[in-house]
Amino acid sequence: MSTTSCRMYENRFPEVDELVVVNVRQIQEMGAYVKLLEYDNIEGMVLLSELSRRRIRSVQKHIRVGRNEVVVVLRVDKEKGYIDLSKRRVSPEDVVKCEERFNKSKAVHSIMRHIAEKHNVPLETMYTTIGWPLYRKYGHAYDAFKLAISNPDHVFEGLEPPKSGVINDLLAQISRRLTPQPIKIRADVEVTCFGYEGINAIKAALKAAEDVHTEEVPIKVKLVAPPLYVLLTNALDKSLGLKKLEEAIGAIEKSITASNGTCTVKMKPKAVSETDELELADLMKKFEKENAEISGDEEDDQSGSE
């Protein structure tokens, strides 16, 4: 048996009405031949009549070779190995639900395959001794793996791994790959105050924003270049992070308007990528350099006038 290939689920064939993810291999007159990615690439067919509810003028508009599709199982002949599938009976909600399950199954499969190769154990043996029992107990092995990060003894209790060291290595892989990573969230605001309190009012408003922080959602305010400031946080819960930055902006607005100042939101709170972070760092360096050059010019002017 192979250490790299095996179906993801215990049943060798999908059930009728089950949603599955397929990869389109070729398109013929009868329909599209596909491989069921969760079932070790066994072959299935989507008849042309099951591609779309609308009249088909161009097959390529509905299905393309090489692309993954979510389809539903219509018929299964286990003896002959025939699997008939439909794309037109799949709703947008079905697609979201199926892709979510597939992504979880794919993550589990990658971890299981890594351990199987490392210990030279057939991948199917890994599934029969660990993977599928966890599917039965927890609904999905991915959910069991996530729970194992904090409570491994409870999750793996009663399992009989094929070799010693498998569970420890499995847990190490789970912790490395599935431990939640903080999401970087950012908002940009312009804060000005030309009233009597001026810069002190701005400082107080920015401090009010940082005071909104919690242990789960720390908040920092950084100057880019007056009057532009960025609000930054790292949060495991994206929605909570966004909500807290909204609250921080509200705190700025309340504080600064009390001093006859203004707060203008230039970018609403959003999750940012590494590229966004690098662009921000470059922008801040640029303004630091410009400020240093201005300071140098002022010093030269003062020394020249003496």
From Swiss-Prot:
The modification Phosphoserine is found at S52, S273, S295, S303, S305. Residues 17-88 form the S1 motif domain. It is found in: Cytoplasm, Cytosol. CDD domains: S1_IF2_alpha (cd04452). Signal peptide: none annotated. One of its GO terms (molecular function) is protein-tRNA adaptor activity. Gene3D superfamilies: EIF_2_alpha (3.30.70.1130), Nucleic acid-binding proteins (2.40.50.140), Translation initiation factor 2, subunit 1, domain 2 (1.10.150.190). The modification Phosphothreonine is found at T179. GO terms for biological process: cytoplasmic translational initiation; translational initiation. Keywords: Cytoplasm, Initiation factor, Phosphoprotein, Protein biosynthesis, RNA-binding. InterPro entries: NA-bd_OB-fold (IPR012340), S1_domain (IPR003029), S1_IF2_alpha (IPR044126), TIF2_asu_C (IPR024055), TIF2_asu_middle_sf (IPR024054), TIF_2_asu (IPR011488). GO terms for cellular component: cytosol; eukaryotic 48S preinitiation complex; eukaryotic translation initiation factor 2 complex. Eukaryotic translation initiation factor 2 eIF2 is a heterotrimeric complex composed of an alpha, a beta and a gamma subunit. Belongs to the eIF-2-alpha family. eIF-2 functions in the early steps of protein synthesis by forming a ternary complex with GTP and initiator tRNA. This complex binds to a 40S ribosomal subunit, followed by mRNA binding to form a 43S pre-initiation complex. Junction of the 60S ribosomal subunit to form the 80S initiation complex is preceded by hydrolysis of the GTP bound to eIF-2 and release of an eIF-2-GDP binary complex. In order for eIF-2 to recycle and catalyze another round of initiation, the GDP bound to eIF-2 must exchange with GTP by way of a reaction catalyzed by eIF2B. This is Eukaryotic translation initiation factor 2 subunit alpha. It comes from Schizosaccharomyces pombe (strain 972 / ATCC 24843) (Fission yeast).
